[in-house]
Regions:
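The serine-hydrolase catalytic nucleophile loop
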Residues: 100-112
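Conserved hydrolase catalytic core segment
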Residues: 113-120, 127, 164-219
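Non-catalytic accessory segments flanking enzyme active sites
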Residues: 14-86, 90, 282, 291-294, ...
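Alpha/beta-hydrolase
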Residues: 1-7, 11-16, 21-22, 26, ...
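Glycine-rich "HGGG/HGxG" loop immediately N-terminal to the catalytic nucleophile
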Residues: 57-59, 120-122, 131, 135-148, ...
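Alpha/beta-hydrolase active-site loop
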Residues: 147-164
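C-terminal subdomain of alpha/beta-hydrolase-fold enzymes, centered on the catalytic histidine
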Residues: 102, 238-393
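Short beta-strand element of the alpha/beta-hydrolase
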Residues: 91-99
């Protein structure tokens, strides 16, 4: 086994450099106080000043280091992850996979609700052993190699859960890129995965063109086709010229802050007020993970993979077999302010759908916005499947 304990330890010099850069921030003269054209200039100024003079990274670092963090080298890739043990008899192991532009921080509010449900108004028999890896190229995980590595992360997760942690069978949950990784994991290892729970249908299925579509499916795919023109410019540039963008964001903390925080405002159920869902500290700590690890460029890799010619060919070939549903049970929790709103019949083309929940509120960052709603849906979905999990090795 290659497991080793991990603690975040950002050098003092790196924090001093950051404060200097923030003090020298040169923002455009625009004083607008709205989000209509992207990042709100007035709010960016406010955030930059708080980051420079009010935000206490060392306090946040200490909070994160109170979590059981590890790194494991799997093949040639070192993977960072949290491994939080459940409270009670025979907790069900589950791997939670985040997306972009967040990090393992997505699940911090969810972890205690899953590991110790009895302490939060739930049933102790619903407890989970929770594993939260950082995607390759995010935070403290090694970057992936180019050329389709995004679609091999499921293999890393399988080895992490079985070889490194000793779980013969386990559950999986994900959203955004996490849903793609979770699907691949379940398709490749149905004997190990007892079920999957997702907050979206992986975007890449839009490349598949079934001959017959319901009216709802047609509307959904039409909305997907509009996405690059209405909301998806970030994905286009990250998928075609990631290095160009990364040069600027890796050098400018204010630029990085704007690029990431704007998505938290746009994609959450915040009614226009991003701080109604996320505190300044939550927003900044997520950005700090990108800044201190210089991982914004490597976080773009899945987008580059998705648009790379070889990967597209791989996807089209894979589609011939992946048109059939995943063999393991799947549950979906759909949040109204997320980026896409697929109908159930679209999901049923690719998944063995056993649960479909339309949530009353919440957005793309559901585990941060509505952790209680998400936790309860995960508990209920996996409750009848618990007998299929093998004891911990």
């Amino acid at each position: 086994m290659s497991l080793r304990l991990f603690e975040i330890d950002v050098p003092d010099a790196a924090l001093a450099d950051l404060r200097g850069r923030l003090a020298r921030t040169r923002l455009p003269p625009d004083e607008a106080d709205d989000w209509s054209a992207g990042m709100n200039p007035a709010y960016l100024r406010e955030l930059v000043e708080y980051w420079r003079s009010g935000y206490d990274f060392r306090a946040r670092e200490a909070e994160l280091n109170a979590l059981p963090q590890f790194r494991a080298t799997i093949g040639s890739t070192a993977v960072h992850f949290i491994h939080a043990r459940g409270v009670g008899h025979a907790p069900l192991p589950i791997v939670l996979t985040h997306g972009y532009p967040d990090s393992f921080l997505r699940f911090l509010k969810l972890i205690p609700l899953l590991t110790d449900p009895a302490a939060h108004g739930g049933d102790a028999s619903d407890a989970f052993d929770v594993v939260v890896p950082s995607l390759p190229g995010y935070a403290f995980s090694d970057p992936p190699q180019r050329g389709g590595a995004t679609f091999n992360i499921g293999e890393l997760w399988h080895k992490l859960m079985t070889n490194e942690l000793g779980y013969a069978r386990f559950a999986a949950h994900g959203g955004d890129w996490g849903s793609t990784v979770t699907e691949h994991l379940a398709r490749s290892h149905p004997a190990a995965v007892i079920g999957i729970h997702l907050t979206d249908v992986p975007f890449w299925h839009a490349f598949q063109k079934p001959h017959t579509l319901s009216a709802a499916e047609k509307r959904f795919l039409e909305s997907i086709e509009q996405f690059p023109r209405t909301e998806g410019a970030y994905a286009v540039i990250q998928g075609t010229r990631p290095e160009t963008l990364a040069q600027g964001l890796n050098d400018s903390p204010a630029g990085l802050l704007a690029w990431i925080v704007e998505k938290f405002q746009r994609w959450s159920d915040c009614g226009g007020d991003v701080e109604s869902r996320f505190t300044k500290d939550e927003l900044l700590t997520n950005v700090m993970l990108y800044w201190t690890t210089q991982s914004i460029g490597s976080s773009f890799q899945p987008y580059y993979d998705l648009t790379h010619a070889n990967v597209v060919r791989w996807m089209l070939e894979t589609a011939k077999t992946w048109i059939h549903p995943v063999k393991v049970p799947a549950g979906f929790a759909l949040f109204p302010k997320d980026l896409s709103h697929p109908p159930r019949e679209w999901a049923e083309r690719f998944f063995y759908v056993k649960r479909w929940t339309q949530m009353p509120r919440g957005g793309h960052f559901a585990a941060m916005e509505e952790p209680e709603l998400l936790a309860e849906d995960i508990r209920e979905f996996f409750r009848p499947l618990r007998g299929h999990a093998a004891p911990h090795a």
